[in-house]
Amino acid sequence: MKFTHELIPFEELTATSTSSGRLYETPRGSYPSITTILGKQPDKQKGLQKWRDRIGHEKADRIANTAARRGTNIHEHLESYLMTEKLPLNEMPTTMAMFSQMKQVIDKNLEIINASEAPMYSDTLRVAGRCDLIGIWKGERAIIDFKTSSREKQRKYITDYFLQCTAYSMMFEERTQLPCKNIVVIIGCDETPMAQVFEAKRDDYVDDVKRIINDYHA
């Protein structure tokens, strides 16, 4: 599909991985990534540790590394497709299947691309990050995030995805002065024939995002 590109420029940011998480260098200093902040929530760290203890650390590392590699692969293919319409070649069947199911929902609903892999930050929140996609989705501007999963997701278990996108929306508005109130999370899933699509309103999560970020910086 040929997309309309009405690109909004963003200043590139240098990112560094540290022992405490990912940091972005902004004109006003180093800010942690929103994914780092969300991952540092006490309940998230406890849950992750319980999972690692239950299945064993070596197996947990293998699962995490495999998931990370596949996620990176899918993200790179989607970015290339969105910006150049090029399709991936010579990929593993499982990767192609996941890319194809995500491509289908994107082709159906995405009208205009404003930015892909956009580096953003907020001086107000003291947070930064890189947003997968910003564009016009079903007639309205939205923050669009790509996820991959081996299992089908339930909405009640993906609140952090909405929080992450809400933070991107707040960064976007601070940087551009343009409204962006909608969230779309697209999950490529091994268990489903089509990608899962979850839509939400940014304003439902703003207070929680502010609280979590303030707690992190306290």
List PLM regions with ranges.
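Metal-dependent nuclease catalytic cores that hydrolyze phosphodiester bonds in DNA/RNA
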Residues: M1-A128
